[in-house]
Amino acid sequence: MEGQDEVSAREQHFHSQVRESTICFLLFAILYIVSYFIIIRYKRKSDEQEDEDAVVNRISLFLSTFTLAVSAGAVLLLPFSIISNEILLAFPHNYYIQWLNGSLIHGLWNLASLFSNLCLFVLMPFAFFFLESEGFAGLKKGIRARILETLVMLLLLALLILGMVWVASALIDSDAASMESLYDLWEFYLPYLYSCISLMGCLLLLLCTPVGLSRMFTVMGQLLVKPAILEDLDEQIYMITLEEEALQRRLHGLSSSVEYNVMELEQELENVKILKTKLERRKKASAWERNLVYPAVMVLLLIETSISVLLVACNILCLLVDETAMPKGTRGPGIGSASLSTFGFVGAALEIILIFYLMVSSVVGFYSLRFFGNFTPKKDDTTMTKIIGNCVSILVLSSALPVMSRTLGITRFDLLGDFGRFNWLGNFYIVLSYNLLFAIMTTLCLIRKFTSAVREELFKALGLHKLHLSDTSRDSETTKPSANGHQKAL
């Protein structure tokens, strides 16, 4: 009987492993397909050139798609775990959800951590160096020569990073950075390096998310139809039509030899056509879309932002009085044992919405920063080098999202796998400072956003607008140059 029980246990374990592997593969396949279509939408079509370059581009495209799929998996990791916990609580003995268990969720967290490290330290550097390589001088040109150069560059990069990490660990803890620890690469240096990358990602989120939370109002205002209050859309369309006709007459009147003026006028005409299309869309929009959807979305964004700041403020108070509020505190109950939200399923749904909202805001804020403005992908006009840079940036942001959500107290779900082993998560001063900075920066960005119009009028009244003390050009409506060269805002 004991032998049969042992065989039965081994068979059950084998079937569980096969089932979990199949589920993980199917989930990743879906994410990979979606990521592939996203990259193809932005990839420049002219990148497909010679046979050798075409092979290099295809390999780089495969690696970039893999990285973007891993990023999407890291974003979905925490929401999937939260909703799985609530489903297991609601249906603990349901036959159709036996595949959903703690082992599967732990496996997903471990795979996300493993693939994030693999993409960040191996695949993306390989894709970049492989794309830029030409082969060493004296060797026969071809794929093998480019692969050899790429591997040499990767080896040199690995030695450089290993040396920097060893020096950094020596400055922090001289005992940990002994010569014997050089042999402990997997257990010490790689987790330490990923912990540093995670901290950098959280700091980048700290910079991008408050900016994105304020920019979300502008972005949604550009996507939705605004109410036409005290505006005559027919007159504006008539004016923009006259401007379009004037530009077309000027364009046809110029000789083809004046290439610079022709290109400038074509770009100006394209901008005018885009503005005309937006005005016609506003005119054709229904009264419900104009007068209800836009205010409702703005109020919803304001509520979500306010709830986020309120949760961070409550988390700051919890950190001051309760040490279990630390992200690296005591482990709570297992998955499916107890609800981690005070309001049950409704609270879990709110946490998931806020996590996605913070991720979207961080991406919007990332591309809104002037330093990363050139990284913004354009449809059918993004080079593979820029795609690789965008994939790395999204990977860093998405990998740090679960850590940031737990650090800010957006959710109480414990970080699983390597995500919960970062050393800095146990530092009270770092965690408290992170929460304080997030709350202060978000509040200041929102105040700056909603008082920009008042500041502009005040600067104009005082005659200070010529000094460019207020930078609201990114949030205001874009002014279009008219046919006579003067600026005209519609």
From Swiss-Prot:
Keyword annotations of the record: Coiled coil, Membrane, Receptor, Transmembrane, Transmembrane helix
GO BP: embryonic digit morphogenesis; embryonic hindlimb morphogenesis
InterPro entries: LIMR, LMBR1-like_membr_prot
Coiled coil, from the record: 256-287
Cytoplasmic side: 41-62, 132-151, 209-291, 361-383, 448-490
Keyword Ligase: no
A GO cellular component entry from the record: membrane
Topology with respect to the bilayer: Multi-pass membrane protein
Family from the record: Belongs to the LIMR family.
Functional description taken from the UniProt entry: Putative membrane receptor.
Protein name listed in UniProt: Limb region 1 protein
Native organism: Mus musculus
